[in-house]
Design a protein with these regions (language model features):
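Small/polar beta-strand repeat architecture
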Residues: 2-9, 14-44, 53-124
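Intrinsic-disorder/low-complexity, polar/charged segments enriched in Ser/Thr/Lys/Arg/Asp/Glu/Gln
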Residues: 32-34, 135-139, 163-165, 177, ...
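Short structured motifs
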Residues: 123-127, 185-186
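Short beta-strand and beta-hairpin "edge-sheet" elements
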Residues: 167-212
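Short conserved beta-strand and strand-loop elements enriched in small hydrophobics
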Residues: 46-53, 91-95, 162-171
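Oligomerization/assembly interface segments of phage tail-like spikes and tubes
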Residues: 127-146, 194-209
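Soluble sensory domains of the PAS superfamily and closely related sensory modules
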Residues: 157-161
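Short, conserved charged micro-motifs
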Residues: 147-154
Length: 213
């Protein structure tokens, strides 16, 4: 039976700190991809934000560390076998120290692919190939509590147009992690006699990463 996730009991954590970048000298094409970084100091279970030239498939993405050694670590569960060749980049340890606990509704969009028409005058049936995927976007209604530390952190990121790493942990332990932009002004909305809410939008920058535990 499928491990079904529901939007209940979901923990939402936002990056509160991002460590200085550690130089990455190589990323293998393997499953999982192995990262070379001298004296990186990471431990298994840490989350890192990767910047990468060449291997664009991992650029701007959040990964969990596994198989950590003094000068190397793995991108847990990430199969890089068919990815482009890595040339240079870095890794930054993420601290997910800010909790958001005021969200009341969620709508997700994006992640679907554009398709490119490849039909020629010789074809009898149209053909197409997948192009680029659209960015994943999560739109929430939040209880309007202007003193809430989580909402204050979201507004600060929004005001500064700063990227923040985000982690959703579902009740069955499945996780979604990504780097993205926050959009919120903490403007109050709602209807007569109902609770006051405020909209929050998070748009992924780079592809999300998922984990089963």
């Amino acid at each position: 039976m499928a491990n079904v996730s529901i939007w209940a009991g979901v923990a939402v954590a936002i990056q509160s700190a991002l460590a200085a970048s550690k130089t990455v000298t190589a990323v293998t094409k393997a499953s999982p991809g192995a990262v070379s970084s001298t004296a990186h100091g990471y431990s298994d279970g840490d989350y890192v934000l990767i910047t990468a030239l060449g291997m664009s498939q991992i650029n701007g993405r959040v990964f969990r560390v596994s198989g950590s050694a003094t000068n190397s670590f793995n991108l847990e569960a990430e199969d890089t076998t068919l990815y482009d060749t890595f040339t240079s980049g870095g890794a930054q340890k993420i601290t997910f120290g800010t909790t958001v606990s005021t969200l009341t509704t969620v709508n997700a969009s994006g992640g679907d692919f554009d398709f490119i028409d490849t039909t020629t005058i010789h074809d009898l049936i149209k053909s197409q190939i997948p192009g680029q995927a659209t960015s994943s976007t999560y739109t929430f209604d939040s209880i309007w509590d202007v003193a809430d530390a989580g909402l204050v952190a979201l507004k600060t990121a929004s005001d500064n147009k700063a990227q923040r790493c985000v982690r959703f942990t579902f009740a069955n332990a499945q996780k979604l992690v990504f780097n993205g932009y926050i959009g919120t002004t903490l403007s109050p909305t709602g209807s007569a006699g109902d609770k006051v809410t405020t909209p929050v939008t998070i748009t992924a920058f780079g592809r999300p990463t998922v984990y089963s535990t």
